[in-house]
Amino acid sequence: MSYGPLDMYRNPGPSGPQLRDFSSIIQTCSGNIQRISQATAQIKNSMSQLGTKQDSSKLQENLQQLQHSTNQLAKETNELLKELGSLPLPLSTSEQRQQRLQKERLMNDFSAALNNFQAVQRRVSEKEKESIARARAGSRLSAEERQREEQLVSFDSHEEWNQMQSQDDEVAITEQDLELIKERETAIRQLEADILDVNQIFKDLAMMIHDQGDLIDSIEANVESSEVHVERATEQLQRAAYYQKKSRKKMCILVLVLSVIIVILGLIIWLVYKTK
């Protein structure tokens, strides 16, 4: 398995600014979250080799690059989520609800992926510190330097000179070990800085979730307001229909009464003319 940097997780694209819509940002964020999860599993697998026979400078270098690349991917996703929150809302209430559900699901997935990634980051940091502690405990530099100072006081024979040369070689090896320790300490400082970056992302995510809650309240208020208007309109239509029906009924009664009156008047007139 390769433990190289996260090049395959990078999203190629033009260097110039791009106008992105809601769907494209959602798709990019979803892909990034999946890649963060995949990289976390890869880091965890590499971490299991630290402190074993498979441990090497190359492994540690690749692990550091992979971890840092994943951290950058998380920061990129965080910025995309901020951009997502700045997009104008659609006019349709149903579309607003759909977008809100998509954003909720996306932020939940991102939070879960970040939790797993940060847990692995901290475990890698612990293992690196344990490895440095073991290396320092096994270092012979202090004792050998003390022996070297004693030998520098006097060496009267060729045997003492050869012994001194041998000790110089051992000291040189130990200094190389210490150089590796310094490199690991630098890597740990970078790792801890990346962990702090993830902490900041969590804070930003919490703020976005809070804003999302305010947005949900606003949408629900708009929905309730729309429902009230619909109910009022329905009630008014029902009243209008009732009054219209009542008016028609009165009109029918009036027409019927007028018809009866006309008939009666007609009969009276007919009877009058008939008697004459």
UniProtKB/Swiss-Prot annotation:
One Pfam short name = SNARE
Kindly list any coiled-coil regions of this protein. 33-131
Please give the chief subcellular localization of this protein.
membrane
Q: Name the membrane topology term.
A: Single-pass type IV membrane protein
Q: Which family does it belong to?
A: Belongs to the syntaxin family.
Its subunit composition reads: Associates with the BLOC-1 complex. Interacts with BLOC1S6. Interacts with NAPA and SNAP23. Identified in a complex containing STX6, STX12, VAMP4 and VTI1A. Interacts with GRIPAP1. Forms a complex with GRIP1, GRIA2 and NSG1; controls the intracellular fate of AMPAR and the endosomal sorting of the GRIA2 subunit toward recycling and membrane targeting. Interacts with NSG1. Interacts with TPC1. Interacts (via N-terminus) with VPS13B.
This protein's name: Syntaxin-12
Taxonomic source organism: Pongo abelii (Sumatran orangutan)
